[in-house]
Amino acid sequence: MTSAADGPANRWPWAAAMMATAVTCALAGCMTQAPAGRTPSAESTLPPDAATWLLTRAALAQLSTDPVVRAGLQRSPVEEILQPGQVPLPGLAATIVVAFPAVAALEAALAGHRLPAGTRAILYDPEVWSFTPAAEQRDPVRAATTAAALAHAHGLQLIVAPALNLTTVLAPGSSAPRWQRFLDLQLAARIARITDVLDLQAQSLERSSASYANFVREAAAQARSANPGVTVLAGLSANPPGPAVDSQQLTSAILASWPAVDGYWLNLPGRGPQCPTCNPARPAVGIGALRAVIQRGLPSHGRRHPAPGSELAAHRH
């Protein structure tokens, strides 16, 4: 998940058994509004179609240091992204998702039985970077089709998270911003036909809640037009390249884009090989945003698109 700046102003259906909702949700979209003068408590009764939170192992560990956020996450549909070789965090119920930036790496891990016990889903994350082969960058739909076949053959669900920077390879001559090229190329629709979950890497737009929401709404509508059963998530970053963002900007992006999506991939990146232009990690930004969403709540979106394998999440402690 990268965060290159390319916003309008500038610039990973679950199988029936996996769709049953067993994790009550608390974080976003389902907290009832507290009476005036009262703060919503951690004991609020919550409907079953709240926002899903897709989080890396590191992000989940950092966010869980805050008691309010930890309590919310414990009653929310949470998907924990692991890299090959990692083990899930102890003491937190989450559905295990293992991430791969390349189909060959996924195929090798499956053939070698190297996925952690309890893995329920695969995240395929194609981007224009050294981790995704050039052939997959040139045809991410074909690569995602192969990833889906591999995942489904092993009883796993698939999340695909195509980066906006793929458009620099797919439509190199266009002067339109990347988000517009992504829509024009119908990438959301084409990948939605293949995958169980589509993650829209919209984090580069989060500094403007209007720009973020406009792209997310249009891409989500495009995806559901192609596959009404697809689950759609949207990306957020507490630390994208460029000017620093704050918690309010993330909260505003969530409030502006919900209920167009079913949840969010909230990333807390630090500078490293997968994000060489990221600023130093700022987990407090993500914590602040989630605290605000817990306290404010979000309206029910009326859809019944549970998180990947969410009924299984309650059984891992």
Describe the predicted segments one by one:
Residues 2, 19-20, 32:
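Position-driven detector of the extreme protein N-terminus
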Residues 4-18:
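Bacterial N-terminal signal peptides that target proteins for export
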Residues 5-6, 33, 44, 313:
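Intrinsically disordered, low-complexity serine/threonine-rich segments
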Residues 27-45:
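C-terminal region of N-terminal signal peptides and the immediate post-cleavage residues
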Residues 40-317:
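Glycan-processing catalytic domains of CAZymes
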